[in-house]
Amino acid sequence: MEKISEIIRMRLKEAGVRYNSNDNISEYVKEGELEKLQQEVQDQFQTVLDSLVIDTANDHNTQETAKRVAKMYVQEIFGGRFQPTPRVTAFPNMGYKSMYTSGPISIRSTCAHHFQNIVGKCWVGIIPEDEVIGLSKFNRLVHHIAERPQIQEEMTSAIADRLSLFAK
C-alpha cells in the first residue's frame, strides 16, 4: 500500500509545484489526507523511538509519545505547510499615507537545517496605497508563515513578500 506522503508528493510533482520545507502545500492535500499523514508520521516516529532503544510499551513517560509528536508536527509546528493562507480582507484607504505597524508579534518556527526551535519577536509594517488591512491580519499572516520549517532569513523574506501584496 502506498504511503499518503508518496501520493501527495506525486501530486505535487505532476503539478510541477515546488514542495520545499517552507512551502505551503495545502492546495494539494485533499480532505481526509492530513489525518492519514499524521498517522504516517506517528508510525515513522515510533520507528525513531524504537531505533533509539526506548521502551515505549513499558515506560509511562513515552507511551503515546509518537502520537503526540505527530500531532504536534502536522497540526502545530508545521501547520503553515498544510493549512490554507488566512483570508485577509483589505479596505479602501481613506487617505492614510504613513507607515502603520504591528508588534511585537511572537514567532515560533523551526530551523530547517537542524529542526531546532526558532523563537523570537518581530515588528511588521506597511505604507498603504489604495487599500489597508486590519492590524490583526499582520499577526495571522506572520504566524501562518512561521509555522513551517525554514531558515530565519527565508522566513523574513516570506513575511515581507506576503505583506507587500497588501501595500497597494
Residue ranges and their predicted role:
Residues 1-168:
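A domain-level signal for the structural core that forms small-molecule/cofactor-binding pockets
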